[in-house]
Swiss-Prot record:
GO biological process: positive regulation of translation
One GO term describing the cellular component: plasma membrane
Protein name as annotated: Elongation factor 4
GO molecular function, one term: guanosine tetraphosphate binding
Organism: Shewanella sp. (strain MR-4)
InterPro entries per the UniProt record, alphabetical: EF-4, EFG_III/V, EFG_V-like, EFTu-like_2, G_TR_CS, LepA_C_sf, LepA_CTD, LepA_IV
Positions of disulphide bridges: none
Gene3D superfamilies: 3.30.70.240, Elongation factor 4, C-terminal domain, Elongation Factor G (Translational Gtpase), domain 3, P-loop containing nucleotide triphosphate hydrolases, Translation factors
């Protein structure tokens, strides 16, 4: 056991985590040169295309250290994006140490800090590593000082390496062996294994990634899942080297996979504990805190017969992505679908893309909303995440919107732009600290403003240098109203949105204009209105198509033309009473794009 090292790699987006993992795998000979390709752990197509890590992946390597001993290194590559921070905290729970990778050109960023604090809270040893020293703009001295100043860990003797060129990789491995403590645990005690991750394989059933805290799990053992109390037999156990490699047993302190032919999807929930069916452990390990979704959106299959497939797909995906929340929802405009809760907009985009790609579905999403706390006149408090469920205005005593605390790190030359943006988003400044060239600003912002397009705007006003990390703190009273869109006097539930009263004129006008472009002309006039309660605040009309009925009249009396025109008018009037308007898919998507 004293030769096992479990560690994670944490860093901000694009500081080189995945490339560093590639080098470690190569140096330790986990894969032959033929099988090696760039970012070998980012196995999802989506991860490769966007160049980001979404799922944490684990690898076990053998490393022969300079002192002649052979060590088993289990490491987990984690995502750097703020929406996936729960993936990071899960990975950290399985480790004794973490490598904090910092780009020697960019320096410390908000996400580096957030993940590093998570690691320190879990009492892990954090080892700083300066990456990308081959770049011309690299300045390791300044960055090391920055790490000490902002993060507060000793970084003067931090290893300097370049994952791309392979310089300093051996030193990184030595540091891992020297500075990260071996796992603690009792091989004789009853088995306790923490499920770090699980995914569904159509041939093998549920595959779970586990970290053995105490005891040993052998192939063929009968084990039980502590939260459900169900018993299963371990058909295969093993490790990833990154290839799936079978072993006869997983010992204390190791990280590996278990396949038990569990067919029902929630058979082994993430964060659960496995123990042996006979002589099992008394109590489960402390799991992870359940992540609360921050953003909700209705998602509907374009053709209704795909509803069942959509439900299966969501079930399979939620096994792999523990933070996904969904419940059935129906809409008069879009039929049956699900209300899905996400951690943020990137998460929402990724989930939708994964559903469309991996499960071949055609989906349409309504505008995302956050959860509001509503105090009713009857004195009870309800939580609303769907604009259609908002009680009538006269029943509402007070609306409260969620407020987040946003920590922004920005170079001082862009500070002005960032402050302007935060004020425009109804933020209040709480704190500002200068660290050398960087400024750390803390703002309290309404979550609704943050989830919409705050991140993109922040990046564009600061040329990509500002970085953001936020978490929910409380609900604050706010003057929020529901904006409805009426088409020919009928409310379209899928287009409703909850916004701040100061934005309704501007938003309502923009919306009806956009809808006017997108709804095709019919044989009769279509009135598109934006309303708050019974008050109409904006309107536009899609003009009717009409046949030129007077074309056959040459000369003659004007009453002849009038007769024909009036006859046409009567017909249009009758048509309007019975006519239905089809709202095209693009119109729903336009609502999402409005803020661009």
């Amino acid at each position: 056991m004293k030769h096992i090292r479990n560690f994670s790699i944490i860093a901000h987006i694009d500081h080189g985590k995945s490339t560093l993992s590639d080098r470690l795998i190569q140096v330790c000979g986990g894969l032959s040169d033929r099988e090696m390709d760039a970012q070998v752990l980012d196995s999802m197509d989506l991860e490769r295309e966007r160049g980001i890590t979404i799922k944490a992946q684990s690898v076990t390597l053998e490393y022969k250290a300079k002192n002649g001993e052979t060590y088993q290194l289990n490491f987990i590559d984690t995502p750097g994006h703020v929406d996936f921070s729960y993936e990071v905290s899960r990975s950290l729970a399985a480790c004794e140490g973490a490598l904090l990778v910092v780009d020697a050109g960019q320096g410390v960023e908000a996400q580096t800090l957030a993940n590093c604090y998570t690691a320190l809270d879990m009492n892990l040893d954090v080892v700083p590593i300066l990456n990308k020293i081959d770049l011309p703009q690299a300045d390791p001295e300044r960055v090391a000082a920055e790490i000490e100043d902002i993060v507060g860990i000793d970084a003067m003797n931090a290893v300097r390496c370049s994952a791309k060129t392979g310089v300093g990789i051996d030193e990184v491995l030595e540091v891992i062996v020297e500075q990260i403590p071996p796992p603690e645990g009792d091989p004789e005690a009853p088995l306790q294994a923490l499920i770090i991750d699980s995914w569904f394989d159509s041939y093998l059933g549920v595959v779970s990634l586990v970290r053995i805290k105490n005891g040993v799990l052998k192939k063929g053992d009968k084990f039980k899942v502590m939260s459900t109390g169900q018993n299963h037999t371990a058909d295969r156990v093993g490790i990833f080297t990154p290839k799936q490699t079978d072993k006869t047993e997983l010992k204390t302190g190791e990280v590996g996979f278990v396949i038990a032919g569990i067919k029902e999807i929630h058979g082994a929930p993430v964060g659960d504990t496995l123990t042996l069916a006979k002589h099992g452990a008394e109590k489960p390990l402390p799991g992870f805190k359940k992540v609360k979704p921050q953003v909700y959106a209705g998602v509907f299959p374009i053709s209704t017969d795909e509803y069942e497939n959509f439900r299966d797909a969501l079930n399979k995906l939620s096994l792999n992505d523990a933070s996904l929340f969904f419940e059935p929802e129906s809409s008069s405009a879009l039929g049956f679908g699900f209300r899905i809760g996400y951690l943020g907009l990137l998460h929402m985009e990724i989930i939708q893309e994964r559903l469309e790609r991996e499960y071949d579905l055609d989906l349409i999403t309504t505008a995302p909303t956050v959860v509001y706390e509503v105090l009713l006149t009857s004195g009870e408090t309800v939580y609303v995440d769907n604009p259609a469920d908002l009680p009538a205005i006269n029943n509402i005593e007070e609306m409260r919107e969620p407020i987040v605390e946003a920590n922004i790190l920005v170079p001082k030359e862009y500070l002005g732009n960032v402050i302007t943006l935060c004020i425009e988003k109804r933020g209040t400044q709480v704190n500002m600290v200068y660290h050398g060239n960087q400024v750390a600003v803390t703002y309290h912002l309404p979550m609704a403003e943050v989830v919409m397009d705050f991140f993109d705007r922040l990046k564009s006003t600061s040329r990509g240098y500002a970085s953001l990390e936020y978490n929910f703190i409380r609900f604050d009273p706010a003057d929020m109203v529901r904006l409805d869109i009426l088409i020919n006097g009928d409310r379209v539930d899928a287009l409703a949105m909850i916004i701040h009263r100061s934005n309704i004129r501007h938003r309502g006008l923009a919306l009806v204009e956009k809808m006017k472009e997108l709804i095709p002309r019919q044989m009769f006039d279509i009135a598109i209105q934006a309303a708050v309660g019974s008050q109409i605040i904006a309107r536009s009309t899609v003009k009717a198509l009409r046949k030129d009925v007077t074309a056959k009249c040459y000369g003659g009396d004007v009453s002849r033309k009038k007769k024909l025109l009036n006859k046409q008018k009567e017909g249009k009037k009758r048509m309007k009473q019975v006519g239905n308007v089809e709202v095209p898919q693009e119109a729903f998507l336009a609502v999402l794009k409005l803020n661009e």
